[in-house]
């Protein structure tokens, strides 16, 4: 594949984002326990990166080794570069943990007791805990011709034990494997009286490595080292063969834990011959092995901030506000009747969205509710409201995306519960994930003595997930605008029925009109710039990868259009290249909250068209998903989106990173006045 316009590598871009996340852990202005959390978030992100992106690269190399990546590199060269950078990132992560964060935690009375630091009393407590709580659950596997190397589960914690001696059957013992069941706690609190610290903890691996001999009686343990294997977690569902998506998916889910290995993590002190054996058994090469100085899974430390009651070491809690348009109205329907309502999460509460649905479930005038679900969590008041509505006799239709990665099982469970109470459940369109965030409520109203049906809509950039609504930045729009409501109605009809392409008046919809409308809007700016008029594009999203959009932005820059991009994660566009993209800037905001809203701004001859969307500018969002972009027409709300979603990010000089033409990011440095987008919005909206 030849590359007409220069692009940056996707996998390297993802690692770059995780480097920016890890930089939060090094920032002394970030509270200490939050710095630990950022280290854990980096580990969690890397797990998914290997399960999906690196697994995909390995498959491509096996299937078509001569192919090129979209940025023009050979697959093998790209893989080698990604591995090298990933190794550096992991090394930096563990160095930061052990040399900076853990010593600082110890100074604050938060300590992890390694087995070589246990005194006699601590040792006796640890022995009792191991024998009573751990040993009954563990299953040792001795390796011999009758006990082949087990296929360990994806991301499970395992221990490889080197043994010496003969067992009760006279067999020569060489090696054993112990897998720690997921039911066992990865972190155990040591009693305060024994610890000597305000908060003392022991890792599961410390118990295992010290007492593993109890699992192999009368044998000598020469070494015991932890390891973890990451596997390909993509699910394969043959779209041409399936007759029931839910049944097909339920059959595939167990296989996720046993896919092809893509990464081996071992403790740094693991003997070389043991590492070689693990690599052979995993069918991996040396470059796929990550030797870490400490625990092989730092995600397990994510629970520590929740276990430690030290508000001074965490982000200051906040109370999200609620717009007066809602608090001053008798019901949510009255509030929306008075005008469009914009909610900016997490600064403004997600509760009004729940209240809208809960009121709809109980309102005798409501006759129908339609809802899309992508991610909503295992304990969702929103889903409870949908089930209550169905039990109350409403016509409830829910489009549940069963293929939302890593939420498949949760969504299958919700689909079953919804069907059990009489809701209509559909799974979208096979081959096109439904990623759009839409709620439609149909209500019977009486005006001037005449009854009619009135529609109410909520559209969002983020999921219907109350927990992430406090962690992610997103916009939501509540409206009774007739044209928007009609468009949303038609999209739901398309998702639940079978029909041709829609003609929508207000919404841009993928995989049909969203991509061409974006290109057309950029072209208007190009034409205006060439005519000597003011022209500008500002867009905010999670990722920018789609080549034809990037080509249009390059052309816009060359025509003199000022293009400002706020891309939190991976961006394949090269900014600031003379003659190509010198009029384009790319920023990434990384802070307390995950930047998640998608905003498209086009100057449009002064009309200032503003669209909010669930879609990033990626191939998958524009061509392989059902997405919608919706306009903000109300002038006051439009100014809010521009100010709160775009301008504050462009002015941020504390949490913003600027991309340079080589693809590397450098943190923007504050001048005399510090401007932090998220902190400014917290101060504006929250108490």
From Swiss-Prot:
GO (cellular component) term, any one: polyphosphate kinase complex
GO molecular function, one term: metal ion binding
EC annotation from Swiss-Prot or TrEMBL: 2.7.4.1
GO biological process: polyphosphate biosynthetic process
Cofactor(s) it depends on: Mg(2+)
Catalytically driven reaction(s): [phosphate](n) + ATP = [phosphate](n+1) + ADP
Residues annotated to bind ATP: 45, 472, 568, 596
Enzyme class: transferase
Processing after translation: An intermediate of this reaction is the autophosphorylated ppk in which a phosphate is covalently linked to a histidine residue through a N-P bond.
Domain of life: Bacteria
Keyword vocabulary terms for this entry: ATP-binding, Kinase, Magnesium, Metal-binding, Nucleotide-binding, Phosphoprotein, Transferase
Active site, UniProt feature: 435
Keyword Transferase found: yes
Binding residues for Mg(2+): 375, 405
Family the UniProt entry places it in: Belongs to the polyphosphate kinase 1 (PPK1) family.
Listed HAMAP family: Polyphosphate_kinase
General function of this protein: Catalyzes the reversible transfer of the terminal phosphate of ATP to form a long-chain polyphosphate (polyP).
Protein name as it appears in the record: Polyphosphate kinase
Taxonomic lineage: Bacteria, Pseudomonadati, Pseudomonadota, Betaproteobacteria, Burkholderiales
């Amino acid at each position: 594949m030849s590359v007409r316009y220069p692009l940056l590598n996707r996998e390297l871009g993802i690692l770059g984002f995780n480097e920016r996340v890890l930089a939060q852990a090094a920032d002394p202005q970030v509270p200490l326990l939050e710095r630990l959390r950022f280290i854990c978030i980096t580990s969690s992100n890397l797990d998914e990166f290997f399960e999906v992106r690196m697994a995909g690269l390995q498959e491509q190399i096996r299937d078509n080794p001569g192919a090129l990546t979209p940025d023009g590199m050979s697959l093998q060269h790209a893989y080698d570069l990604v591995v090298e950078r990933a190794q550096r990132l992991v090394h930096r992560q563990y160095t930061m943990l052990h040399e900076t964060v853990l010593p600082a935690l110890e100074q604050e009375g938060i300590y992890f007791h390694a087995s070589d630091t246990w005194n006699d009393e601590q040792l006796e407590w640890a022995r009792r805990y191991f024998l009573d709580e751990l040993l009954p659950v563990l299953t040792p596997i001795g390796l011999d011709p009758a006990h082949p190397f087990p296929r360990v589960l994806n991301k499970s914690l395992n221990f490889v034990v080197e043994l010496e001696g003969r067992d009760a059957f006279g067999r020569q013992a060489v090696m054993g494997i112990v897998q720690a069941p997921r039911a066992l706690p990865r972190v155990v609190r040591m009693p305060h009286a024994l610890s000597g610290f305000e908060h003392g903890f022991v890792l599961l691996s410390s118990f295992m490595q010290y007492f593993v001999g109890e699992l192999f009686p009368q044998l000598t343990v020469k070494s015991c080292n932890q390891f973890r294997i990451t596997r390909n977690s993509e699910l394969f569902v043959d779209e041409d063969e399936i007759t029931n998506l839910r049944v097909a998916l339920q059959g595939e889910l167990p296989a996720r834990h046993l896919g092809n290995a893509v990464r081996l993590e071992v403790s740094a002190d693991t003997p070389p011959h043991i590492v070689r054996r693990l690599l052979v058994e995993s069918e991996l090469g040396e470059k796929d092995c990550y030797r870490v100085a400490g625990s092989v899974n730092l995600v397990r430390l994510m629970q520590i901030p929740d276990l430690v009651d030290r508000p001074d070491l965490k982000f200051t809690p906040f109370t999200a506000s609620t717009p007066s348009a809602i608090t001053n109205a008798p019901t949510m329907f009255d509030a929306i009747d008075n005008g469009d309502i914009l909610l900016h999460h997490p600064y403004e509460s997600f509760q009004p969205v729940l209240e809208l649905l809960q009121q709809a479930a109980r309102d005798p005038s409501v006759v129908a509710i339609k809802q899309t679900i992508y991610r909503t969590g295992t304990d969702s008041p929103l889903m409870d409201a949908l089930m209550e509505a169905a039990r109350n006799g409403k016509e409830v239709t829910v489009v549940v995306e069963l293929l939302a990665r890593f939420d498949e099982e949760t969504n299958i469970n919700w689909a079953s519960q919804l069907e059990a109470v009489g809701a209509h459940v559909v799974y979208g369109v096979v081959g096109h994930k439904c990623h759009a965030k839409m709620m439609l409520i149909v209500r019977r109203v009486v005006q001037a003595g005449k009854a009619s049906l009135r529609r109410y809509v909520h559209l969002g950039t983020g999921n219907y997930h109350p927990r992430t609504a406090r962690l992610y930045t997103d916009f939501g729009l509540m409206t009774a605008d007739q044209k928007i409501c009609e468009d949303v109605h038609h999209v739901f009809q398309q998702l639940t029925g079978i029909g041709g392409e829609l003609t929508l008046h207000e919404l841009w919809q993928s995989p049909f009109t969203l991509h061409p409308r974006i290109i057309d809007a950029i072209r208007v700016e190009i034409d205006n710039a060439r005519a000597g008029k003011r022209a500008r594009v500002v867009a905010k999203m999670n990722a920018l990868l789609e080549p034809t959009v990037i080509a249009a932005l390059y052309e816009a820059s060359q025509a003199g259009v000022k293009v400002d991009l706020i891309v939190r994660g991976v961006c394949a566009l090269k900014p600031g290249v003379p003659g190509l993209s010198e009029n384009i800037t790319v920023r990434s905001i990384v802070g307390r909250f995950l930047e998640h809203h998608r905003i498209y701004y086009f100057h449009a001859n002064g009309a200032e068209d503003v669209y909010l969307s669930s879609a990033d500018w990626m191939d998958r969002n524009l061509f392989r998903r059902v997405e919608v972009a919706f306009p903000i027409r109300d002038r006051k709300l439009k100014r809010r989106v521009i100010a709160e979603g775009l301008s504050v990010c462009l002015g941020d000089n504390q949490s913003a990173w600027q991309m340079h033409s080589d693809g590397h990011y450098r943190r923007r440095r504050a001048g005399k006045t510090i401007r932090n987008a998220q902190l400014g919005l917290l101060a504006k909206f929250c108490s």
